[in-house]
């Protein structure tokens, strides 16, 4: 099974339009005025640390025998994981990394952003 997990952080006081942000920023890779810039290098370093027992084919592609694989796509404002055959615990580990940077998960499979803990 494959799925994508998407993360961003809104600027303070802007209107939230999750579907538009997903399409424009996460799918098309375009900058969006309503979003904060993210510390992408720090995020990638944290991902590499958390998944240090996985094979890193490069900074954006990870795989592990029997555990699946994932690809990381970033712009200065978003992080998107395309996940293939991953276990729930590993998916949760990806989510935890981005939550640590104040970025809630948006799941396009159900058109839901899990942001009840933040207004950003």
What do these predicted ranges mean?
Residues 1-120:
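Acidic (Asp/Glu-rich) sequence patches and key acidic residues
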């Amino acid at each position: 099974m494959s799925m994508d997990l998407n993360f961003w952080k809104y600027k303070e006081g802007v209107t939230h339009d999750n579907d538009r942000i997903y399409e424009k920023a996460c799918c098309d890779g375009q900058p969006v005025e309503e979003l904060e810039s993210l510390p992408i290098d720090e995020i990638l370093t944290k991902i590499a640390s958390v998944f240090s027992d996985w094979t890193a084919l490069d900074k954006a592609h990870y795989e592990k025998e029997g555990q699946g694989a994932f690809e990381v796509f970033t712009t200065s404002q978003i992080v998107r994981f395309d996940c293939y055959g991953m276990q729930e615990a590993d998916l949760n580990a990806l989510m935890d990394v981005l939550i640590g940077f104040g970025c809630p998960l948006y799941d396009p499979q159900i058109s839901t952003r899990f942001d009840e803990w933040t207004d950003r």
